């Protein structure tokens, strides 16, 4: 997966999809009460990016619904994964709980109500910290409560705090989440990968490859914009690379030394199926 980073308005969304990105990551802000409000990152953000792009969350959901619906004039077949990077820090536990319910309600309203089941996009609900686990809990409960339990097949989960892998697994076990888990490791592109290192990324890949007992479906690295970093990630066996330059990542993927092992994912590929590094 070539995952376009910080896709927070429609102009940049079109640009990245034109480049060939098959996944987008969007920052979602919340009110103090936990109501999803807008796609917005703000400053500081990645180097060489405009931090203040924004659009309302409802408009964002309507647009991505159109883009992922076959037969719609705006349909883009390469839009497979939508990573919702949830800006939850500072919210109370009650607000987090409400936020999980409201996100489920909004996804259902824009994508799946009224008998609509043909949208092709899959979501990853990306929570910053394991201490905010109640958000995932109430999201899953609300999906069942509103009759959308079957649509959990289109939803995955991720914690982005670069935390201890065993602690993260224990939280997933507590929540009863045993599949559809995307695991990530990374750092802003303003900091050289040399300073971050890849030991935790390698640990995630090892855990993914351990067998049926593992809890990880996919592993992605962020935010990789340099060729050396992208090549290293591919050699380690990641499933996705989040980047500010999707076309650049795809061009590396298509080089002979990598295309024999990798290809860009399509709709026929299950975003939650586990593939081992070879």
UniProtKB/Swiss-Prot annotation:
What is the tissue localization of expression for this protein? Expressed by the venom gland.
Give the active-site positions.
Answer: 5, 41 (nucleophile)
Which cofactors are reported in the record for this sequence? Mg(2+)
Q: Which residues bind Mg(2+)?
A: 25, 27, 85
In which broad location class does this protein mainly occur, judging by the first location in its UniProt entry?
secreted
Protein localization: Secreted
Q: GO annotations under biological process?
A: killing of cells of another organism; lipid catabolic process
Q: Which domain of life is it from?
A: Eukaryota
The protein's annotated catalytic reaction(s) are: an N-(acyl)-sphingosylphosphocholine = an N-(acyl)-sphingosyl-1,3-cyclic phosphate + choline; an N-(acyl)-sphingosylphosphoethanolamine = an N-(acyl)-sphingosyl-1,3-cyclic phosphate + ethanolamine; a 1-acyl-sn-glycero-3-phosphocholine = a 1-acyl-sn-glycero-2,3-cyclic phosphate + choline; a 1-acyl-sn-glycero-3-phosphoethanolamine = a 1-acyl-sn-glycero-2,3-cyclic phosphate + ethanolamine
Instruction: Quote the InterPro entries the UniProt record gives.
Output: PLC-like_Pdiesterase_TIM-brl
How the cofactor is bound: the record states: Binds 1 Mg(2+) ion per subunit.
Which cysteine residues pair off into disulfide bonds?
45-51, 47-190
Q: List the Gene3D superfamilies.
A: Phosphatidylinositol (PI) phosphodiesterase (3.20.20.190)
Task: Give any GO molecular function from the UniProt entry.
Answer: toxin activity
Give the GO cellular component terms, alphabetically.
extracellular region
Q: Which UniProt keywords apply?
A: Cytolysis, Dermonecrotic toxin, Disulfide bond, Hemolysis, Lipid degradation, Lipid metabolism, Lyase, Magnesium, Metal-binding, Secreted, Toxin
Known EC number: 4.6.1.-
Tell me the protein family, please: Belongs to the arthropod phospholipase D family. Class II subfamily.
Question: What is the protein's known function?
Answer: Dermonecrotic toxins cleave the phosphodiester linkage between the phosphate and headgroup of certain phospholipids (sphingolipid and lysolipid substrates), forming an alcohol (often choline) and a cyclic phosphate. This toxin acts on sphingomyelin (SM). It may also act on ceramide phosphoethanolamine (CPE), lysophosphatidylcholine (LPC) and lysophosphatidylethanolamine (LPE), but not on lysophosphatidylserine (LPS), and lysophosphatidylglycerol (LPG). It acts by transphosphatidylation, releasing exclusively cyclic phosphate products as second products.
Write the protein's name.
Dermonecrotic toxin LspiSicTox-betaIE2i
Organism encoding this protein: Loxosceles spinulosa
